[in-house]
Swiss-Prot record:
<dbReference type="GO" id="GO:0005886">
    <property type="term" value="C:plasma membrane"/>
</dbReference>
<dbReference type="GO" id="GO:0000155">
    <property type="term" value="F:phosphorelay sensor kinase activity"/>
</dbReference>
<dbReference type="GO" id="GO:0005524">
    <property type="term" value="F:ATP binding"/>
</dbReference>
<dbReference type="InterPro" id="IPR036890">
    <property type="entry name" value="HATPase_C_sf"/>
</dbReference>
<keyword id="KW-0902">Two-component regulatory system</keyword>
<comment type="function">
    <text>Member of the two-component regulatory system GraR/GraS involved in resistance against cationic antimicrobial peptides (CAMPs). Functions as a sensor protein kinase which phosphorylates GraR through the auxiliary protein GraX. In turn, GraR up-regulates many genes such as adhesins, exoproteins, transporters, toxins, and proteins involved in cell wall synthesis. Down-regulates the expression of many genes involved in RNA and amino acid synthesis or glycolysis.</text>
</comment>
<feature type="transmembrane region" description="Helical">
    <location>
        <begin position="43"/>
        <end position="63"/>
    </location>
</feature>
<keyword id="KW-0547">Nucleotide-binding</keyword>
<dbReference type="GO" id="GO:0004721">
    <property type="term" value="F:phosphoprotein phosphatase activity"/>
</dbReference>
<keyword id="KW-0418">Kinase</keyword>
<dbReference type="InterPro" id="IPR004358">
    <property type="entry name" value="Sig_transdc_His_kin-like_C"/>
</dbReference>
<keyword id="KW-0046">Antibiotic resistance</keyword>
<protein>
    <recommendedName>
        <fullName>Sensor protein kinase GraS</fullName>
        <ecNumber>2.7.13.3</ecNumber>
    </recommendedName>
</protein>
<dbReference type="InterPro" id="IPR050351">
    <property type="entry name" value="2-comp_sensor_kinase"/>
</dbReference>
<dbReference type="InterPro" id="IPR005467">
    <property type="entry name" value="His_kinase_dom"/>
</dbReference>
<dbReference type="Pfam" id="PF02518">
    <property type="entry name" value="HATPase_c"/>
</dbReference>
<feature type="transmembrane region" description="Helical">
    <location>
        <begin position="15"/>
        <end position="35"/>
    </location>
</feature>
Length: 346
């Protein structure tokens, strides 16, 4: 079937030749019918020989010219086609040379842009790490504040700044996340408690507590740093859109998979917004005047969850709250997925 495709392509590209040769032969036959001095038998012989030789010529040309395009169809690298001299006709060589020059130029641009992106990533990473020093010093100064009301307000703003810096750092590292992962069995409860501790200043100001209920063995096979980032972003959203209601956090076992749920009783997500919650920079259409949301939290979560093998479920009702469920994979599922990725890279 594939050969028939190439035959059809070849005949279509040579259709003007074929029509011209047929026209010339029909013209000779027409002249022989008008002019009786032309021996009709000899002319039929010449026309038959001419058409036969033309057929042989087309077959030989087909095998010679289609060979290069079959290499293209097999997705062979242009470098291999050029260096192995697989182009046979002058026009084919010219085409291959042109493609080689263009692809080489584009590859150089890609390498240059990748270097610029790496430098940009390194610059932002260094900036975030550098600014963490005065932010940490600021925390020490805030701890010395004796006015509790003022201290609480300052800690609230400090927690927001610290959270935004961490988010920016993770955004910068998104491109290199696969190289930055190390899988091991870690305690889900320990990660959740550590993240709750980081958000305690915000939750205290907003009058929000945490009801934690871990019913099953909470050890999961994951990367602790990126998994904590996911939990942090979900907790941050729950705190941001809730007031004076506790956030419920717990684990369940579904088909041998540990699942973590985080349930808030905030304003919820509308049905029209639900399909877009993972888009970069998307914020709720219900509160366009709100400036505290960057729309990056769930985008980060969605960008990382597949690498961790986590299945994410979000359910929400406007005015009643949102439940986010993280379903963690088994170890053999992670190993199998990583093996597939490794095979694809080769």
């Amino acid at each position: 079937m594939n050969n028939l495709k190439w035959v059809a392509y070849f005949l279509k590209s040579r259709m003007n030749w074929i029509f011209w040769i047929l026209f010339l032969n029909l013209l000779m036959l027409g002249i022989s019918l008008i002019d009786y001095d032309f021996p009709i038998d000899s002319l039929f012989y010449i026309v038959s020989l001419n058409l036969s030789l033309t057929m042989i010529f087309l077959i030989l040309t087909y095998f010679k010219e289609v060979k290069l395009y079959k290499h293209f169809d097999k997705d062979k690298e242009i470098e291999e086609i050029k260096h192995k001299d697989l182009a046979e006709t002058p026009f084919q060589r010219h085409t291959v040379d042109y493609l080689y020059r263009q692809i080489s130029a584009h590859k150089e641009k890609v390498v240059e842009q990748q270097l610029q992106l790496n430098m940009h990533e390194q610059t932002i990473t260094e900036f975030v790490h550098d600014i963490k020093t005065p932010v940490t010093a600021m925390k020490l100064l805030i701890d010395q504040e004796k006015n509790q009301e003022r201290k609480q307000a300052l800690l609230y703003e400090w927690s927001r700044i610290n959270s935004m810096l961490d988010t920016q750092l993770y955004i910068t590292r998104l491109e290199s996340q696969r190289k930055d992962m190390y899988f091991d069995y870690v305690s889900l409860k320990r990660m959740v408690i550590d993240e709750i501790q980081l958000t305690r200043h915000i939750s205290q100001v907003k009058g929000i507590g945490f009801d934690v209920d871990f019913k099953v063995d909470d050890y999961v096979y994951t990367d602790i740093k990126w998994c904590r980032m996911i939990i942090r972003q979900i907790l941050s959203n729950a705190l941001k859109y809730s007031e004076n209601f506790n956030i419920e956090i717990g684990t369940e076992l579904n088909d041998q998979h540990v699942s973590l749920y985080i349930k808030d009783y905030g304003r919820g997500i509308s049905k029209k917004d639900m399909p877009r919650i993972f888009e970069r920079g998307f914020t709720s259409t219900a509160n366009r005047n709100e400036t505290t949301s960057s729309g990056m939290g769930l985008y980060l979560v969605n960008s990382v969850k597949d690498q961790l093998g986590i299945h994410l479920q979000v359910t929400s009702t406007v005015g009643k709250g949102t439940t986010v469920r993280l379903i963690f994979p088994l170890q053999n599922e992670i190993v199998e997925r990583m093996s597939e990725v490794t095979n694809l890279s080769f």
